[in-house]
Amino acid sequence: MNEQLKQINIHLHAMIGSIEYVQRWWLSPNISFQLRCPQEVWDSGVEGRDEVEAFVMQAAYGGGA
């Protein structure tokens, strides 16, 4: 697992509270990604990875995204 993904998962776990729910989050359609799953956005390339990271960090530190 790369460091960027590791940090995202750490933040998600802190917000969501369970590894199982973090795994579900990655595979669930998300309105912030035009109903695409975060995993699909992540897998689309560097821009997708940055988009997912920005979303999670905004939710963690800057309020709801």
Regions inferred by a protein language model and the residue ranges of each:
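Non-transmembrane "mature" sequence context
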Residues: M1-A65
